[in-house]
Amino acid sequence: MGQDERPADNRRQVFLDRRIKRIDMTPFVLASASPARKRLLQQAGIDPIVHPSDFDESQVQLTAPAELVSVLAEQKALATMRSLWEKRGDLQLVGYGRLFSRTPGLILGCDSVLSLNGEIYGKPNDAAAAIARWKQMRGQVGELYTGHALLVPYSEQGVLMPSAALVRAQMTRVFFAEISDRQIEAYVATGEPLFCAGCFALEGRGSLFVEKIEGCHTNVIGLSMPLLRQMLAEVEVDVIDFWQK
């Protein structure tokens, strides 16, 4: 529902010192293996290169959900940036090389969690955990947070740096239905909630068990498209230019 920015002293904000002039030659890298995030981008006319991050999320222990997803999103984007840089010699044939040419590319990292009754939840570990989670969630109001980190990597004399690093968090309130044990068990048996931070997929069968939401619906799916448009504008990229690639 609301948009949170990490405190200035905690967020690395480097002002853009170079401009992306030819978006048709600019690769957009998604530092996530999420099919839902990839699908959202493609539906909006952005065809991303998927290069998931290998960042170890257990390194980050924070209790504020907006700060947690922001830090994780940024670290995932940075890890992917470093990985691409290390492999750049092998990436020319598939187009990644453009990331580190004189035309900078874009790397998007994301992370989502559900906050419910003061607790923060990621993906459930197994079916038993998912069933227990849903028994807590039913009839309750949760807050789904997604962190977004947009990096513009640039190389200068062999040194890699982000010439812009934008980090934002978005929150959407989710009103869960009062559903039966039988419905919970049947839903978990589909396997769908096991792959979702909120233990449900708004774009799938989970939509049956959500009464309403307050805020950005794509944020619940894993990526706030309106927020992404705003972040791209901050680095002087008009999202519609991707349609011409």
Stretch-by-stretch model annotation:
Residues 13-24:
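Short, Lys/Arg-enriched N-terminal segments with co-localized hydrophobic residues
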Residues 45-63, 162-171:
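Short glycine-rich, Thr/Ser-proximal phosphate-binding strand/loop in the N-terminal lobe
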Residues 25-28, 66-245:
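Anionic-ligand binding patches
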Residues 24-46:
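N-terminal beta1-alpha1 ligand-phosphate binding loop
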Residues 33, 53, 153:
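Cofactor-binding loop segments of dinucleotide-utilizing enzymes, especially the Rossmann-like FAD-
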Residues 4, 9-10, 17:
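Intrinsic-disorder-associated, low-complexity terminal segments enriched in Asp/Asn/His/Tyr and depleted
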Residues 19-20, 61-62, 68:
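Accessory recognition modules or surfaces
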